[in-house]
Structure formats: C-alpha cells, structure tokens
Regions:
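N-terminal leader/targeting and assembly helices and adjacent pre-domain segments
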Residues: 1-161
C-alpha cells in the first residue's frame, strides 16, 4: 500500500514539473520576443543616429528618439508582465485540477471537490502581505525598472546584451 502512494506522489510531482516546464518555456519565449523587439528598435535608433556621424553620449541621451526608445521598453515590459500574468492564471488552476484535486479524490467522495469559488478564494488570499494580482504587478514593475536601467546602461556604455 505504501508503494502505491509513493508512485502516486512521484507521478503527481512529474505532472507538476511538466506543467511548470511548459510554463517556463512559454514565458521564456515571451521574454525573448520582447528582447528581440527592443534590440530591433535600438538597432534602428542607432542606425538613424549614426547616419549623421558618430553620436556622442550627450547627443544620444538628449535625442528625441530616446523618448521613443523608452516608451518602447516600457510597452514591452508591460506586455511581458501581462503575458506572465495570463500564463500563471492558466497554469495554477490547471495544476490544481490535475494534481491537488486528483489527490483529494482519494480522501473525499466525488461530489465534495472544492468548488470554483474556493479555488478563486485561495488565489485571492494574501501571501507575504500581498494578493496574487499585487504580487504580479510588483514583480512586473521591478522587471520593468531593471530592464529599463539595463537598456540605458547598454546604450550609454555601448555594450550588447549578449
């Protein structure tokens, strides 16, 4: 009997890892797309500026196109944050349905599964003093600030992200 539960636990852990890996791949694809979009915009900006001679740091900093670049970065960060939120919204209920609810079936009758209202309530419960949505936006804003600072540093110092 004990062997059955060990196999069951391992199978459920493998399901969770598979779902998490799928989520990670999809998020990684979104991040690469955003980075490529930003790189393309930076290349276009530098090409426009360099066609008039070698730009100085001051010229680059004060160029009106810098504002467009910053807007592009902010838009890409917002898009990445929204995509991450959408992927998590899709992943968490799926993991619950396939793993936790399956395990609960062994201990409860079929008509006593957690209702959708309780699942939603568990997602809305505060963790570390913040609810799910607030944590997503906190992480998104931190990512946006870091990305904006990195891009600015790359432009000023002439480095590439690779």
């Amino acid at each position: 009997m004990n062997n059955y539960w060990e196999k069951r636990t391992r199978a459920n852990a493998q399901k969770a890892e598979k779902e998490a890996a799928t989520y990670a791949r999809r998020l990684n694809s979104t991040l690469h797309h955003a980075a490529d979009e930003i790189d393309r915009y930076i290349a276009d900006l530098l090409l426009d500026i360099s066609s008039g001679g070698t730009p100085t740091r001051t010229q680059l900093w004060t160029a009106g196109k810098y504002l467009k670049l910053r807007d592009c970065i902010q838009q890409q960060c917002a898009d990445v944050g929204q995509r991450q939120k959408d992927l998590l919204d899709e992943l968490l209920p799926k993991l619950f349905d396939e793993i936790l609810e399956t395990n609960l079936a062994d201990f409860k009758t079929a008509d006593s599964f957690l209702p959708t209202r309780m699942i939603r309530q568990s997602l809305d419960t505060a963790w570390s003093g913040q609810n799910y949505s607030t944590r997503i936006w906190t992480n998104t804003n931190a990512l946006a600030a870091k990305l904006e600072q990195d891009i600015t540093d790359y432009i000023i110092l002439g480095k590439s992200r690779a």
